[in-house]
């Protein structure tokens, strides 16, 4: 047990899918996993373990923002022996070729947060996903006949940013989606010797102002989840 996770030792699988919303974690567990058990519920940050096609997998919420996800991912890695973390979340698009409900695989993550500079002695840390996990996700998407975008995300500290001109800079530099966690998760994984990947569904478009509903964000986005789950099986067989 930790101050934030009350699961017993051995309760988590070596791979954990992590949405921000704990109710999305519940949805994933109940919809896609078999033999599901709730294993943690501190602060209502729900976590579950079950099996997917016979493979033990866990799913747990990580909350919103880098500080929250950093707590949970660090404790999962150092206290529960988790080896791989796959964030499955939502992002906002700034490029016109990235559409609402498209799936984005974040091979890298830029950020305006200072957390990786703190852990990397005030130098710039290149926050990237694990290559093999990324390739497995791309392979899983192709097997499903899905087109996905692979590239850089931007992990923002502020949801309501006062610097809207930054979106123009992001578009110029080819940022695929804006979210709030990937760079932090990649930093934690690097620091503590784990592997990580972020897969997002575009929930809103910053340019067109299109958006999905809160219910859609909680209860759908199944393509992203299936890509994540199938990528685990592909990784096991690599």
Swiss-Prot record:
EC number(s) from the headed UniProt entry: 2.4.2.1
Reactions accelerated catalytically: a purine D-ribonucleoside + phosphate = a purine nucleobase + alpha-D-ribose 1-phosphate; a purine 2'-deoxy-D-ribonucleoside + phosphate = a purine nucleobase + 2-deoxy-alpha-D-ribose 1-phosphate
Binding site for phosphate: 20, 24, 43, 87-90
GO molecular function: purine-nucleoside phosphorylase activity
Entry keyword set: Glycosyltransferase, Transferase
Gene3D superfamilies per record: Nucleoside phosphorylase domain
The keyword Glycosyltransferase is annotated on this UniProt entry: yes
GO CC, alphabetical: cytosol
Binding site for a purine D-ribonucleoside: 4, 179-181, 203-204
GO BP term, example: purine nucleoside catabolic process
InterPro entries: DeoD-type, Nucleoside_phosphorylase_CS, Nucleoside_phosphorylase_d, Nucleoside_phosphorylase_sf
Site label Important for catalytic activity, positions: 217
Keyword flag Ribonucleoprotein: no
EC class of the enzyme, as a word: transferase
Active site (UniProt): 204 (proton donor)
Binding partners and assembly: Homohexamer; trimer of homodimers.
Membership in a protein family: Belongs to the PNP/UDP phosphorylase family.
HAMAP family: Pur_nucleosid_phosp
Function text: Catalyzes the reversible phosphorolytic breakdown of the N-glycosidic bond in the beta-(deoxy)ribonucleoside molecules, with the formation of the corresponding free purine bases and pentose-1-phosphate.
Name this protein carries in UniProt: Purine nucleoside phosphorylase DeoD-type
Species this protein is from: Pasteurella multocida (strain Pm70)
Encoding gene, per UniProt annotation: deoD
